[in-house]
Swiss-Prot record:
Required for interaction with KPNB1 and EEA1, as annotated region: 675-688
Record's protein name: Receptor tyrosine-protein kinase erbB-2
UniProt modified residues of type Phosphotyrosine: Y876, Y1111, Y1138, Y1200, Y1252
Glycosylated residues, chain numbering: N68, N259, N421, N529, N570, N628
Length: 1259
């Protein structure tokens, strides 16, 4: 039994082709169970189609075969793309022993890949007579069939068929065959012989030992789709189908997808490959086209090649057919809308139309090429009363006289009796046959009354057979060279029941003396090729070269006429071509080199306005006239030339005057040019002398706007330091008061003082910071108030009462709402957008460098690393220094390149800090590992309260390509949209049930502990008055009162209560609490009180408003009123006197216990309290979100260590609040160049973070 199995595999190996290159492909049919169009030629049709065929591109339909039919032409078929149908046949067996695979791309009755139906003698009563020989199919003999990819099996009403029920069809079906149905009828007239004992488990296709079924699926080891045996090493390659002889994809019996030169592949090699080195698409020399299940170097004839590498019969949308010079056809994409084409039957809007009728024949008027087919049925000329279609008239068929090509087939089974031929198609040259009638015929003529064909221009039948039968009066069928029309060996002419050739010759219906006796009908116009010469469409014995009119010349056996102006010659040629300059002699005149009917007289040649005058001499040659008149040429002489006219004296005078004027103008122009030349030489000499003596520098204007910001120089006596807020490597920050000389004003300020013995570089850096801060003018960027040039330089800035934003969100984690977070994001983005507009790169944006002026107003600060770009700069390259690694963009770490887009990266990290309530980015990861981590694609995780909308904005900010990051103006728009509907984008648990946003903080309460901090004037109120900013000046009497002023002050009484005094002056009415303020409150305390608190305010103490009358020049321009993402109020409130002036109603004083909860800001979207669920966030390595309360202050964090080469600072007891003025997020690995400040500072803790590296050390 094993020996027999190996013998079967040896037979299969012998049948395996060496590659797809020598595979013979043929077309299938599509007749299903219909009777053949010509039963007498049906077997011949099958023989022509399948003789030597190995792959059937279509269906293999074997129907209506007689019992004695010889079917040996089927024995080479190995693969069928569609289905196999064996029906109504009387043969005993069908030799398909080599058929391995049925792909089922088309299915019989939409379900079956193999159908065997009604193969037996039709017997009355279904019982054969005793001893009678019964015909019909006995055995399938599909011994090599081991794969059906799609479709089931239908075997019915074949009473002589045996062994169909012994086949293990499960082994034949592919594992992914969803239509694996088997409907098998086993009713037989007689018993069948059993399978051979050599067949394992009695699975066979016939009774002999060679008909045993080869199992290639059910016997396989686990995981094998197909195999050659039961061992795990017998598995076939995954691209194999029908079995294999080895494990490689070149050992397959058939390919599951595509056969590439004997190797099974999932895809054919692409025609174009991409070169990653040159970033170009290159032609692939190994590229192949897809043709069925094969990969071919070029598409077969009559198929169209596409740019995507496929062979198709119809071009895709927006493509057009193009025929190359070598005759190959391809689909080419239209550069503009494709030209209109004519569609035939079976295409587009005529897809369901059966025949050409009077209703659709006008679709083909003027068409030279029809994409589709043409069919003429009896209904075409009989009409259809049901659809009100009139009969087609013979004269209407003349629309096809211009037709030259049909891409489908031509089928004619009815034709008008008044037309003895098909001469309406006399210019038809090609029938391509891309679509065939019944899947077999490209030309079918049957049952017609014509006498000859008349297709005199037909030169090609691209595919399919020609069927001409049952035309009782048709002659000249055998005089056509059909073999010259066919393009592949499977094409042939099938003819029967036409008029006998002897009768045609007897009636004189013979060819004109044509070349080789080939013609389409009688007469000289029906020759396929002429034996002598061709004049137009007519064959002639000779051309009219020497006699006859019109005279002709010969070119490539064509008789072509001479020009009409050529003079006919006697006994010699008249011309050498068809043009007027190719005549031997002219019939009338010669205007060299052309023969003309008359000489040109006043004729204007092409593209000329000058007429030409010529006359004919004695020899008939045209000569130019002595006078060439251009206008007023009415007087002509006897030769037809213009007569000579005497010049008028007026003309001479005019010419002289014009000449003199022209000479004067030329002289003036020359004089001016000479003078200017001398001036230029003198100017050049003077400039050279000045440059040589270095008296004047050359001008190189940049076009940049001048920076008109003012630097305010303050005296040390005007400043009073109150307490230390923080200390850094280069100086200390104090809380202080600025008391301008000569004024009764106290302004709370922050004073940054350099340490003693600081390096010159440190002095330069703090002056650079002063230069940057003095030039900004935005409500969201901290401004410089002045500079004090003492022995240690001091910078004076606004005092932000709420400290830095990082400590603020950490301290009030449970009291912040979604609207607060999104409003801060909007304000920071607006500040950074302003810095981008003024070409300032911050380089150090982080939550620690954003100060809180009020709970609703934050400002960007710390410009120690900021750099102002010049007018022609787009980026800044740093040369060293401390940098915040975990906040920096990837291109800013090793290349030291900083742009506005690198600030966008830092902005994304800052937003992440806010959304995690102050968590540390990349917590627990050393700073040196950050670049590698970012290059590998790791980013900070999504904060728990963020929706995907907010997080995706962060992710866009962290794109490697800086050009892919959003601009700040885009970030302003995005977060402004989110701030209008905050709870949709930031989800904080129990936000609606929590307390309102806090007013003060630990840092703010520490500022109020000093008595000197009461009764202060905000710096912006002192410097920037804003009259008429909100509304026009009210007219006298409007509202019944004049303007009054008011401002806010805050103190603490002895009982620790916070008392707010808000008092109006007598000149100004109370203002609406809904009126927006650009500063959103005072610098000392926000005047935007809650309505509940506002109702309790009573009488307010008065204060001298004289400080508010001081005006100073300021280079900034107030921006339009903005609501930072909130909805602005629709009403227009009275205008405040100054920008950050709080607006309240006059109320009695109100004493509050503890911190005062504020109301929702003016114009807020939702009136609701805010809180955050106090749940503990889970830790992690990259960007771990820990409990922000576990962080403590920024200074006490034990993770931040002293850098190399510097002594660690002595620990200090943690203060009650986190000053965070000494930034601990930076590290300079080589601090020697920057000086060595003392390791400790009296009363102020300092720290440096080792996670942040210096730029002067390679990362």
């Amino acid at each position: 039994m094993e020996l027999a199995a190996w013998c079967r595999w040896g037979l299969l190996l012998a049948l395996l082709p060496s590659g797809a290159a020598g595979t013979q492909v043929c077309t299938g049919t599509d007749m299903k169970l219909r009777l053949p169009a010509s039963p007498e030629t049906h077997l011949d049709m099958l023989r022509h189609l399948y003789q030597g065929c190995q792959v059937v591109q279509g269906n293999l339909e074997l129907t209506y075969l007689p019992a004695n039919a010889s079917l040996s032409f089927l024995q080479d078929i190995q693969e069928v793309q569609g289905y196999v149908l064996i029906a109504h046949s009387q043969v005993r067996q069908i030799p398909l022993q080599r058929l391995r695979i049925v792909r089922g791309t088309q299915l019989f009755e939409d379900n079956y890949a193999l159908a065997v139906l009604d193969n037996g003698d039709p017997l009355e009563g279904g019982i054969p007579a005793p001893g009678a020989a019964q015909g019909g199919l006995r055995e399938l003999q599909l011994r090599s069939l081991t794969e059906i990819l799609k479709g089931g099996v239908l075997i019915q009403r074949s009473p002589q068929l045996c062994h169909q029920d012994t086949i293990l069809w499960k082994d034949v079906f592919h594992k992914n065959n969803q239509l694996a149905l088997t409907l098998i009828d086993t009713n037989r007239f007689s018993a069948c012989p059993p399978c051979s004992p050599a067949c394992k488990d009695a699975h066979c296709w016939g009774a002999s030992s060679g008909d045993c079924q080869s199992l290639t699926r059910t016997v396989c080891a686990g995981g094998c789709a197909r195999c050659k045996g039961p061992q795990p090493t017998d598995c076939c390659h995954e691209q194999c189908a029908a079995g294999c002889t080895g494990p490689k994809h070149s050992d397959c019996l058939a390919c599951l997808h595509f056969n590439h030169s004997g190797i099974c592949e999932l895809h054919c090699p692409a025609l174009v490959t991409y070169n990653t080195d040159t970033f170009e698409s290159m032609p692939n020399p190994e590229g192949r086209y897809t043709f069925g299940a094969s990969c071919v170097t070029s598409c077969p004839y009559n198929y169209l090649s596409t740019d995507v590498g496929s062979c198709t019969l119809v071009c895709p949308l927006n493509n057009q057919e193009v025929t190359a010079e070598d005759g190959t056809q391809r689909c080419e994409k239209c550069s503009k809308p494709c030209a209109r084409v004519c569609y035939g039957l079976g295409m587009e809007h005529l897809r369901e139309v059966r025949a050409v009728t009077s209703a659709n024949i006008q679709e083909f008027a003027g068409c030279k090429k029809i994409f589709g087919s043409l069919a003429f049925l009896p209904e075409s000329f009989d009409g259809d009363p049901a659809s009100n279609t009139a009969p087609l008239q013979p004269e209407q068929l003349r629309v096809f006289e211009a037709l030259e090509e049909i891409t489908g087939y031509l089928y004619i089974s009815a034709w008008p009796d008044s037309l003895p031929n098909l001469s309406v198609f006399q210019n038809l040259r090609v029938i391509r046959g891309r679509v065939l009638h019944d899947g077999a015929y490209s030309l079918t003529l049957q049952g017609l009354g014509i006498s000859w064909l008349g297709l005199r221009s037909l030169r090609e039948l691209g595919s399919g057979l020609a069927l001409i039968h049952r035309n009782a009066r048709l002659c000249f069928v055998h005089t056509v060279p059909w073999d010259q029309l066919f393009r592949n060996p499977h094409q042939a002419l099938l003819h029967s029941a036409n008029r006998p050739e002897e009768e045609c010759v007897g009636e004189g219906l013979a060819c004109y003396p044509c070349a080789h006796g080939h013609c389409w009908g009688p007469g000289p116009t029906q020759c396929v090729n002429c034996s002598q010469f061709l004049r137009g469409q007519e064959c002639v014995e000779e051309c009219r070269v020497l006699q006859g009119l019109p005279r002709e010349y010969v070119k490539d056996r064509y008789c072509l006429p001479c020009h009409s102006e050529c003079q006919p010659q006697n006994g010699s040629v008249t011309c050498f071509g068809s043009e007027a300059d190719q005549c031997v002699a002219c019939a009338h005149y010669k205007d060299p080199p052309f023969c003309v009917a008359r000489c040109p007289s006043g004729v204007k040649p092409d593209l000329s306005f000058m007429p030409i005058w010529k006359f004919a001499d004695e020899e008939g040659t045209c000569q130019p006239c002595p006078i060439n008149c251009t206008h007023s040429c009415a007087d002509l002489d006897e030769k037809g030339c213009p007569a000579e006219q005497r010049a008028s004296p007026v003309t001479s005078i005019i010419a002289a005057v014009v000449g003199i004027l022209l000479a004067v103008v030329v002289g003036l122009v020359l004089g001016i040019l000479i003078k200017r030349r001398r001036q230029k030489i003198r100017k050049y000499t003077m400039r050279r002398l000045l440059q040589e003596t270095e008296l004047v520098e050359p001008l190189t204007p940049s076009g940049a706007m001048p920076n008109q910001a003012q630097m305010r120089i303050l005296k040390e006596t005007e400043l009073r330091k109150v307490k230390v807020l923080g200390s850094g490597a280069f100086g200390t920050v104090y809380k202080g008061i600025w008391i301008p000389d000569g004024e009764n004003v106290k302004i709370p300020v922050a004073i940054k003082v350099l340490r003693e013995n600081t390096s010159p570089k440190a002095n330069k850096e703090i002056l650079d910071e002063a230069y940057v801060m003095a030039g900004v003018g935005s409500p969201y960027v901290s401004r410089l108030l002045g500079i004090c040039l003492t022995s240690t330089v001091q910078l004076v800035t606004q005092l932000m009462p709420y400290g830095c934003l990082l400590d603020h969100v950490r301290e009030h984690r449970g009291r912040l709402g979604s609207q607060d977070l999104l409003n801060w994001c909007v304000q920071i983005a607006k500040g950074m957008s302003y810095l981008e507009d003024v070409r300032l790169v911050h380089r150090d944006l982080a939550a620690r460098n954003v100060l809180v002026k009020s709970p609703n107003h934050v400002k960007i600060t710390d410009f120690g690393l900021a750099r102002l770009l010049d007018i022609d700069e787009t980026e800044y390259h740093a040369d060293g220094g401390k940098v915040p690694i975990k906040w920096m963009a990837l291109e800013s770490i090793p290349p030291r390149r900083f742009t506005h887009q690198s600030d966008v990266w830092s902005y994304g990290v800052t937003v992440w800090e806010l959304m995690t309530f102050g968590a540390k980015p990349y917590d627990g990861i050393p700073a040196r590992e950050i670049p590698d981590l970012l290059e590998k694609g790791e980013r900070l995780p999504q904060p728990p309260i963020c929706t995907i909308d907010v997080y995706m904005i962060m992710v866009k900010c962290w794109m490697i390509d800086s050009e892919c990051r959003p601009r700040f103006r885009e970030l302003v728009a995005e977060f402004s949209r989110m701030a209008r509907d905050p709870q949709r984008f930031v989800v904080i648990q129990n936000e609606d049930l929590g307390p309102a946003s806090p007013l003060d903080s630990t840092f703010y309460r520490s500022l109020l502990e000093d008595d000197d901090m009461g009764d202060l004037v905000d710096a912006e109120e002192y410097l920037v008055p804003q009259q008429g900013f909100f509304c026009p000046e009210p007219t006298p009497g409007a509202g019944g009162t004049a303007h009054r002023r008011h401002r806010s002050s805050s103190t603490r009484n002895g009982g620790g209560e916070l008392t707010l005094g808000l008092e109006p002056s007598e000149e100004e009415p109370p203002k609406s609490p809904l009126a927006p303020s650009e500063g959103a409150g005072s610098d000392v305390f926000d005047g935007d009180l809650g309505m509940g608190a506002a109702k309790g305010l009573q009488s307010l103490p008065s204060q001298d408003p004289s400080p508010l009358q001081r005006y100073s020049e300021d280079p900034t321009v107030p921006l339009p009123p903005e609501t930072d993402g909130k909805v602005a109020p629709l009403t227009c409130s009275p205008q405040p006197e100054y920008v950050n002036q709080p607006e309240v109603w006059p109320q009695p004083p109100l004493a509050l216990e503890g911190p005062l909860p504020p109301s929702r800001p003016a114009g807020a979207t939702l009136e609701r309290p805010k809180t955050l669920s106090p749940k503990t966030l889970s830790p992690g390595k990259n960007g771990v979100v820990k409990d922000v309360f576990a962080f403590g202050s920024a200074v006490e964090n034990p993770e931040y260590l002293a850098p190399r080469g510097r002594a660690a600072p002595q620990p200090h007891p943690p203060p009650a609040f986190s000053p965070a003025f000494d930034n601990l997020y930076y590290w300079d690995q080589d601090p020697s160049e920057r000086g060595s400040p003392p390791s400790t500072f009296e009363g102020t803790p300092t720290a440096e973070n080792p996670e942040y590296l210096g730029l002067d050390v390679p990362v």
